Amino acid sequence: DASELNAANGVVSGAGQSLSFAEIVSRGDISRSFSEDELAALPIKPPSARTLIGKPTNALDVPAKSRGDAVYGLDAELPGMVYAHPIVAPTRYGSVIKSIDDSAAKPIAGYQQTLTIDDSSGFVQGMALVIADSFPAAMKASEAVNVEWDAGDTASVSEEDILTEGKSLVDDPETGVLFVNAGDAAAAMSAASDTLSSTYRTSTALHFTLEPQNALVEFRDGQCHVHAGNQWQSLIIPVLAQSLDMEEKDIILHTYYLGGGFGRRLFGDQMIPAAHAARALDKPVKLIMTRPVDSLFDCVRSPSVARLDAAFGEDGGLSAIDHVAAAGWPTLSMAPGFLGEGVDGEGKFDGFSINGADHWYSVPNHRVRAINNKLAQDTFLPGWLRAV
């Protein structure tokens, strides 16, 4: 009889027996459901009897991090590994290497060779990898290697070009996908006693994590072993499998502590060139990006332009908001399955680029449109930027 049971401190007890919440969950599928009427009929504990579930406990990672024992991706090592330092192309997309002259690098002690990367996933284009016995040698040699490219179409695109395109998009009432469409914002604007319009811009933002991007890759027994810090393993493993023409089950990702993620390590694109180099050389390759290269290869938060139009009635109260924002969409490039559906069923949008515009305030007429800035999308790989 449920009335004879008591739930407290993570344990259900009664009739001389007890079962922890963890044991209940571990026993399998909890499929019991309740109708609204059944839920309403359930007794609710008075406030005086309510307690917090769980108890204070020490974070498991603090001792190792405090002592300097924690192993980050940058710390990972394997016997016989060599080091790789990238030389990135002038554009994220479309640049093709014409020639590589490494004659000035050959006298550098420890320099081995410079590789090109053929990535069928399309995320790494026009990159060269300088291989050396040590990372200092790889860094020094990368400054001596001369690479010439046929630059991609966006080589001359500037920040201002992207923002200008964004302004043009938000000023066009026919563009975008409806994220919110409550009431009739257009009619309220037409009938307003007063209106207010403002346009806002944000600039490109880099992640600049304390630990630059890195990856150590080894092929062993027909499997690709990747050692790196990562925030979304199931996002990069399919990309690696496509790029390497391998089965996903043969991509083994060993995850380490992050020296800062902030969304940059949601996508592990730095693993791609390291994996290709490790397979080409048949030995472990540790790729490390210096800060300048890490910045050039970053999946930046896109510049954005947002326009807000507000309408006010005769009483001075807010009667409508029309909000539109244009930016590059990370989800479109990296996780299109997570794109949201427009409220009218006409098109998809990146919720991470517009969330928050569907605010909790009561406005009788509220419309929000999300616009993909294609110029931004074609110029760089937009990324998620997260912080607290």
Predicted regions and their residues:
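Alpha-helical support elements that line or immediately flank enzyme active sites
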Residues: 1, 83-111, 128-148, 215-281, ...
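General beta-strand structural signal in soluble alpha/beta enzymes
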Residues: 5-7, 68, 114-116, 196-200, ...
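Conserved beta-alpha junction segments in alpha/beta enzyme cores
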Residues: 63-64, 70, 75, 185-244, ...
